[in-house]
Amino acid sequence: MNPAPDEPLVCFGFSGFRVPVTIPESGCHSGWWVRGWLLAVVDWYCHTRNGDEEMLREIVRPERLDLDSPGRRDYWVALEHDSIWGDHLFPLTVFVGPEASEGQGLVAFGSNHGNEYEGPVALKHLVREIRLEDVRGRIILIPVLNPSAFLSGTRESRMDDGVNLNRAFVDGAGRHPALSGITHRIADFVRTHIWPRVHIVLDLHSGGDVARFAICANYHPVDDPLQAAKIEETARWFGTPALMIYQNQTPGLLPSEAERLGKITVGTELGWGRAVNPEGVRYGRQGVLAALINNGLMSGTIEPIAHHKAGTQKRLEMVDRGCFIPAPFAGHYEPLVECGTAVKKGQTVGYLHDFDQFDLPPYACVAALDGVVLAQAWAAPVPKGQHIVVVAKDLDR
């Protein structure tokens, strides 16, 4: 039923939907009370306790995003769902300051993988903390890049196409019929709408269910010495105990593509075990803020923290295949040392047990080089072929 012309129409908004409610002004005295109460509820709901910031995000298709006009905008980006009649929605907040220029800005991603939570939590905090009046350039924050994987709490988009987003940045992603699932379309969205607008890329990861790490910021070796220096400096500002320099042979990586485009690109490993590590959140928040302030995208000052401040960060390189110890059979892993421990070549750093061959001795996981245990399997049960220990070369020894 349509309201009479003289009856006000109030739109209630819940989870991105607006529901029209007609409130008649005529009738008994209680009508006035109900009308006033409902309007008060609407006013309370539509504003946060931190001022007049809108809680409701606009749901838009990618082509309707405004990532260039001055101001702040909060979106749910809608990409068509593969099965239900609807959309995958992921949050995007953009700040554009008065000094923003074409092709310059920072993007920070969380939840490239759906079971890694320090990045999403750190970015969710920053969405609320960053003030528009402090913004000078362009800032794009995407706390949950892969909503399908995040919903299922898995590394891949298990409920949809089963693809790992950090392997989806391949030729034809989102364009070729064979690569048209939601995960490849997210990669295409990043390529089409994000890459042209930023020169700094921060991809916040954790170990998830697979591995526990010595907490680190990480990056690949790049040929351009100026780009390499800027990347290392950006990584140091996270404050983590380690900086991981890792192999760049895996196809389809988001950071690899950003690096090839000449962008200052840094990733992280901020925790493990599908939990939220408070130190990981602290490091993630620090790294994003430092990149913003140090590159003139946001006003303010920032001081080094933790291992960056103390000058104790270690550069750990895991480029050679000898760094990795794969499981020769499915079994249960027993670590003998903690991540971050210095070890010698030939030292046994863990055991792999086969409980089906109960009376056999465990398989010894032996370090192939002098270095530091950078990562180990998180769960005790491991499948055949999984890298259960990574011993990285300490470049600062």
Located regions from the model:
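Structured catalytic-domain cores with a bias toward divalent-metal coordination
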Residues: 8-12, 22, 27-28, 32, ...
